[in-house]
Amino acid sequence: MTEDQKEKFAQEKQRLLQNNSLILATVNAEGQPLASSTPFVTKGEDFYICISNKLSPHTQNLLACATANILLVEDESLCRNNFARARMNLNVEAQTVSRDDEVYLEVIDLMQAKHGATVELLKGMADFIMFKLVPAESRLVLGFGQAFAFEAGKDNEATHITE
């Protein structure tokens, strides 16, 4: 990547990480896909979500198959061309986070700061589960001819996809 591409890559990645929600793609035990939207926060390279155990099919899917994909996409109202919207896809492995784990309280505080009072309500609901989504290989698309492959924590090694 050129220095200009590296700078644009870093700026656009950070901009997408400011989104309030992500698209979560999971599969059930029969391999049927499901896409849904959920609020998130990040801590380091990892993403954290809180979803209902009983009401959300994607919760059951993550418990049955920990491999998933998340999508962060540029707001339609901010892009000039919907075919060239900035977007970042990340393949992730989901891990449950116990309420007894010290990171649970840290992440709940981050969620409350980002998403407001609803998080306080969720904390008291026993059926809500926190998942840590650990990224593996990822792709950032910034427009036509501007796709980059990278791995978590290795942004400096991002590769411009030309074929």
Task: Give residue spans per PLM region.
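Short, structured beta-strand-loop surface elements
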Residues: 57-113, 135
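C-terminal edge-of-domain segments
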Residues: 6-9, 110, 118-163
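General beta-strand recognition
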Residues: 48-49, 69, 139
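Surface loops and adjacent helix of pleckstrin homology
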Residues: 53, 73, 143-145
